[in-house]
């Protein structure tokens, strides 16, 4: 065990346009090589095009999409007596949200590689898919839930 103090959690300031901490976390997930302004442009363009399609505020579309993709349970490997079991465990809220954000970005980039469209268009369509409870990120969430459901018998082996 580490003898140092626990690592402090960083405070994330809300973004300038929508005043949302969740959106700033998403921008930080998208950001590559420290280019935050590029990531902000991508996210804001995707949200503005999503606003035009749904006729709702962009940040509320995004929050609903993240809520739909957020997992409630996941499986963790636990080794007992030479056998490894997949034990279903509840996900902490902070981890669940960060998983949802990563899944949205991952499925949007996979869509970009397949289709060859710009990233913000793929991100927009992935956010709308998550908003409507379909798409790659929602499928990842469903797979986590199914895996936990299949291994429900090992839930007594909790950590």
From Swiss-Prot:
Any one biological process term the GO annotation gives: translation
Keywords: Ribonucleoprotein, Ribosomal protein, RNA-binding, rRNA-binding, tRNA-binding
Highest taxon of the lineage: Bacteria
GO cellular component: small ribosomal subunit
Name of a matching Pfam family: Ribosomal_S7
Single GO molecular function: rRNA binding
PANTHER family reported for this sequence: RIBOSOMAL PROTEIN S7 (PTHR11205)
HAMAP family: Ribosomal_uS7_B
Job description of the protein: One of the primary rRNA binding proteins, it binds directly to 16S rRNA where it nucleates assembly of the head domain of the 30S subunit. Is located at the subunit interface close to the decoding center, probably blocks exit of the E-site tRNA.
UniProt xrefs under NCBIfam families: rpsG_bact
Quaternary structure and partners: Part of the 30S ribosomal subunit. Contacts proteins S9 and S11.
UniProt record similarity statement: Belongs to the universal ribosomal protein uS7 family.
Record protein name field: Small ribosomal subunit protein uS7
């Amino acid at each position: 065990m580490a003898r140092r103090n626990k690592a402090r959690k960083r405070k994330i300031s809300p973004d300038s346009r929508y005043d949302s901490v969740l959106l700033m976390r998403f921008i930080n997930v998208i950001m590559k090589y420290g280019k935050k302004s590029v990531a902000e442009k991508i996210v804001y363009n995707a949200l503005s095009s999503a606003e035009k399609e749904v006729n709702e505020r962009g940040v509320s579309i995004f929050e609903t999409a993240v809520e739909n993709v957020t997992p409630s349970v996941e499986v963790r490997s636990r080794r007992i007596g030479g056998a490894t079991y997949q034990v279903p465990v509840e996900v902490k809220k902070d981890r669940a949200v960060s998983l949802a954000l990563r899944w949205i970005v991952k499925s949007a980039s996979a869509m970009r590689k397949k289709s060859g469209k710009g990233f913000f268009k793929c991100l927009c369509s992935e956010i709308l898919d998550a908003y409507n409870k379909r798409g790659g990120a929602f499928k990842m969430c469903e797979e986590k839930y199914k895996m936990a459901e299949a291994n429900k018998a090992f839930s007594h082996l909790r950590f």
